[in-house]
Amino acid sequence: MDILLRDLNPEDIEWIKKKTQNATSQNKFIKSLISEARIKEKLQLVRNSEKKNSYQDSNTPFSFIDLFAGIGGFRSALTFLGGKCVFTNEWNKYAITTYKNWYGDEESTNDDDIRNFNHSLIPNHDVLCAGFPCQPFSLAGVSKKNSLGRKHGFEDADQGNLFDCIMSIVDVKRPPILFLENVKNLKSHDKGNTWKHIYNEISSRGYEIFSKVIDASNWVPQHRERIFIVCFDKSIFCKDRKVNFQFPEFPTKREYSLSSFLEKNPDKKYMLSDKLWNYLQNYAEKHRRKGNGFGYGLVGNDGKTRTMSARYYKDGAEILIEQDGWRNPRRLTPNEAKYLMGFHDKYAKCFGHMNGFPQVVSDTQSYKQFGNSVVPIVVEKIMIQIIAEINSYRQDLNFKAA
């Protein structure tokens, strides 16, 4: 530890002393910095972030952090709109592989357990983005956990307390804007108590809260309902003014059709075997006779698919593409799944991928990643409305200054 301290610049040591109270806390602070033996780089990252927040400065792009980032649904959209990502956290090694390949980040991408990470090391930012894990609250996740006798919601020991981790970061960094996403079941989970807890935790910290369930099928050919939560720090945005944020209006026509990205000659491995296709048909018929809606989801070239889940890799039954003639239906290819989830080329080009985001993990991992992701174009449309509120705030600031 002494050797590392001697390696630091005097101004870095002085800065550490200001951030801590005594030698013990200094030691703990420095240990958290050297988890990857890159103390100088980490110090520079944090110190560079301690500047005027860009939501106040029209000449500076807004900054954001990407928590529980997955493969970067938030990252794609906000960068496309001119934002600068200053910190990313994701602990799944396969998602990290995709994320780093797509966005090229090394220094600002962190794969620690965010619950154990020193939150004071997170750079200052304007927008905290988090699609916090939905399995503890989703209908499918709750059903599975109940069948296994496991806890769900906030009682889920592995993932249920990650929302409280977000609140811990809010307490330390106090971002002006929170931009959160989860499954639509969040509001009804545990008879509304889950949503009450979330609302109260955010509200008690002085944020004005806006929430809405939005179906991505307004923009992409997939039925995918998610709740989006946008929060503004009242001490900033409600000071002698009112927040006029509104969620985006739905377009009259989707931006992308299924046929626009279906491959003409996909590999035969994606076509269902006779055995699997017969099984799925018999399974669907059995449940149809019982009056249940369980079964496969067959869709034509210009239809709207069911929701793609992280389980799609198992048999693909939720989204099957019709084929001509005698051929059995087929699964989506990973490339088609990418476009169905809204990771279109306009986002990829922002990061130098002129032919779209490449597949860098196995088919199985790709399906899992897309099934767990947020749809970038929905994030983009909501962020446009957030930017409008930021610009309105800036205008009010300039008006008062004049």
Where are these regions (language model features)?
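Short Lys/Arg-rich basic patches
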Residues: 1-20
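RNA-binding accessory domains that recognize and position tRNA/RNA substrates
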Residues: 5, 11, 37-57
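C-terminal target-recognition/interaction regions appended to catalytic cores
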Residues: 5, 40-41, 275-402
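Short, basic amphipathic alpha-helical segments that act as recognition/interaction helices
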Residues: 15, 24-45
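Class I S-adenosyl-L-methionine
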Residues: 17, 79, 96-104, 117-127, 137-307, 311-313, ...
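Short, conserved micro-motifs enriched in small and acidic residues
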Residues: 24, 28, 160, 369-377
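Core alpha/beta nucleotide-donor-binding catalytic domains of modification enzymes
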Residues: 48-174, 184-187, 193
